[in-house]
Amino acid sequence: EREQARIRREKVGFVFQIFHLVPRLTAAENIALPLTLAGVNHEEREQRVAEVLASLNLSDRAHHRPAQLSGGQRQRVAIARAVVTRPVLLLCDEPTGNLDHASGIDVINILEQLNAQGITLLLVTHDQELGNRANRIIHMLDGKVQP
């Protein structure tokens, strides 16, 4: 059980449909949270947070709280928090489900860039456009994988 927890903490990132950002923390503090919990030193934490903020075009929003961000910006903060630990696998549950079309396309493009950088993505979605861009599609019906 400890080994499974370590693998989840170090190798897997999670992106949820509902962003699960801490309302009292800034975008940068939300992104830094898993690094803080992992005991990463302050200097490295600041550097990695700055890198992911820049890569997701959020540098100008670093000191904003979630309530001050748009839905697309909140989802990008959630993605940044998931990838700041440099996972090999990113699990995404309806990553575009609560977004307008334009923000959804931005998130899809970000996920494709992460995949091109070597992160394996496992997405759960009802979004046909997102599904059509996947390398492999597995359909489920009533909780069962379809042939």
Where are these regions (language model features)?
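ABC family nucleotide-binding domain
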Residues: 1-140
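Conserved switch/coupling elements of ABC/ABC-like ATPase nucleotide-binding domains
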Residues: 142-147
